[in-house]
Amino acid sequence: SAIAQPKPSITTKHTNDKIKEMLTSFKIANSQDVITPPSVVSSKFNIDFPQARDIEWEVASGIYEVEFEIGYTDYKCYYTTDGDLLMYAFNINVLDIPAVVKNATIAKYPDYDFDDIKEIHRGTEVLFDIELKHRNIEVEMLILENGTILNEKFD
């Protein structure tokens, strides 16, 4: 049976731009594995994602990244040292992509197949990270829930 997706509250302390900046600082730093995050972070995580299992923590630039599973779904999220949730993302099926996002993708790359899809909740935004494949070509797109394409990169 499918497990309901949690819908935790993302902090409103920071603007979307500030959150993006904080996440970028995490990504460019060398993150360290963490056995146990501060209790304020782990207790907030346990409230936000009570069914999480296979939990792995890392830290860099004062940001805690946690990767885990709920049911068969992979998740990743980011907390501040105060336990404020900045972003969470999870893998979704092609059937779960909103029509406007799917249509924007197909319009741009009609011959490509959907490969890996993540739904991202970052600040007040909902985005979709969509990887497409066509023969040997891969493209990764970042699309807002209204269908606006923010970024594309070929691999």
Q: What does each model-found stretch correspond to?
A:
Residues N16-M22, S39-V41, K76-T81, I92, ...:
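Short amphipathic alpha-helical segments, especially helix-boundary/capping motifs
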Residues T12-D17, G62, V66-F90, L132-F154:
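Amphipathic N-proximal alpha-helical interface segments
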Residues F45, F49, Y64, F68, ...:
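Aromatic side chains
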